[in-house]
């Protein structure tokens, strides 16, 4: 293997006198490097802003965004959708959901307590996927900072108010396959976008013909 040769740059001459130092300072300050930096700064100053004034302004979130959970109600009656089956508690990988139920007079499950430990939750969304009644869904409330754990995690914080359910002021859960807002603008080109569809002549040439089927048609 040949030895690689490195090119050594000449060292910069040392400046000793005050006149030379002044000339070097003026050359460095008023040189092309300074104007290049200023030109880039001025260009970005007049370009459209890519940031927003948070928290006064917020970007729209995707329906598939996974934040703090919501416990839904029925839109017509305002009753709770949760039937106390416990599937969300069983499938939870972080073991953060706790449900306490009892049988009522009509032999149906009644929910005594429903808690979610947000300190352990990893927001995977498995509880929302397995729920047969769409009772628990992933919401878009991501501003949940608190100084005490006792301030969040109870059922009353996740449950949709009965008034909002009857007034239909809360949107129905669109599901994990819902389309995000402005998806056309945010969609990036994939390799399949560059594949051209074959023309009609090429497709006809590529379709094979079965001679046995043709013979059968002639005999008929």
From Swiss-Prot:
Residues 187-220 are annotated as: Disordered. Binds 2 [4Fe-4S] clusters per subunit. PROSITE patterns: 4FE4S_FER_1, 4FE4S_FER_2. One of its GO terms (cellular component) is plasma membrane. Its cofactor is [4Fe-4S] cluster. Keywords: 4Fe-4S, Cell inner membrane, Cell membrane, Iron, Iron-sulfur, Membrane, Metal-binding, NAD, Quinone, Repeat, Translocase, Ubiquinone. Pfam families: Fer4_7. One of its GO terms (molecular function) is 4 iron, 4 sulfur cluster binding. Residues 71-102, 112-141 form the 4Fe-4S ferredoxin-type domain. [4Fe-4S] cluster 1 binds at residues 82, 85, 88, 131. Gene3D superfamilies: 3.30.70.3270. Its EC number is 7.1.1.-. NDH-1 shuttles electrons from NADH, via FMN and iron-sulfur (Fe-S) centers, to quinones in the respiratory chain. The immediate electron acceptor for the enzyme in this species is believed to be ubiquinone. Couples the redox reaction to proton translocation (for every two electrons transferred, four hydrogen ions are translocated across the cytoplasmic membrane), and thus conserves the redox energy in a proton gradient. NDH-1 is composed of 14 different subunits. Subunits NuoA, H, J, K, L, M, N constitute the membrane sector of the complex. Belongs to the complex I 23 kDa subunit family. PANTHER family: NADH DEHYDROGENASE [UBIQUINONE] IRON-SULFUR PROTEIN 8, MITOCHONDRIAL (PTHR10849:SF20), NADH DEHYDROGENASE UBIQUINONE IRON-SULFUR PROTEIN 8, MITOCHONDRIAL (PTHR10849). This is NADH-quinone oxidoreductase subunit I. The lineage of its organism: Bacteria, Pseudomonadati, Campylobacterota, Epsilonproteobacteria, Campylobacterales.
């Amino acid at each position: 293997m040949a030895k690689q040769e490195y090119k050594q740059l000449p060292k910069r001459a040392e400046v000793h006198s005050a006149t030379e130092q002044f000339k070097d300072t003026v050359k460095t300050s008023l040189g092309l490097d300074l104007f290049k930096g200023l030109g880039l700064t001025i260009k970005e100053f007049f370009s459209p802003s890519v940031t927003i004034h948070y928290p006064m302004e917020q970007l729209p979130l995707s329906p598939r965004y996974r934040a703090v959970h919501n416990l839904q109600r029925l839109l017509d009656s305002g009753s709770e959708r949760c039937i106390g089956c416990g599937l969300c508690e069983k499938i939870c990988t972080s073991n953060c959901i706790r449900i306490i139920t009892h049988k009522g007079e009509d032999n149906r499950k009644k929910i005594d307590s429903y808690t979610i430990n947000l300190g352990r939750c990893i927001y995977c969304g498995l509880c929302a996927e397995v729920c047969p009644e769409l009772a628990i869904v992933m919401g878009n409330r991501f501003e949940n900072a608190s100084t005490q754990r006792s301030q969040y995690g109870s059922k009353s914080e996740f449950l949709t108010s009965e008034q909002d359910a009857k007034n239909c002021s809360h949107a129905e859960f669109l599901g994990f396959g819902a389309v995000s807002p402005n998806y056309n603008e945010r969609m990036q080109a994939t390799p399949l976008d560059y594949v051209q569809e074959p023309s009609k002549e090429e497709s006809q040439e590529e379709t094979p013909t079965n001679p046995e089927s043709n013979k059968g048609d002639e005999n008929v």
